[in-house]
Amino acid sequence: VETNEILDTSVALDAKEGIITIFTLIEHPPCAEKFFDILFPETKDYVIALEIAKKLRQQGTPVGAIDMLIAAMALNRSLAVRTCDGNFKNIQVVMPELGLR
């Protein structure tokens, strides 16, 4: 398990350990029974998420708030996102520094 990546819900479902956000835990409470480190958002994460939202809206490709927040949390901490969710590719278009796996 990589320690330099956040697992999105789409990946965390099958994982036993790693780093997830509180949003993944809320989306899938059984994750609490696994060995995950849980990240909580900071003020800067919301600022970055708003920047992502503005850029996506300008391109006409808005995505869900939770995905934007997870991406923002990864960007703020220089982490990648491991995901099977295509919305993160849309985010990467406007934030190319977002690492995806």
Regions found by a protein language model. Give the residues of each.
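Conserved SAM-binding loop
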Residues: 38, 63, 81
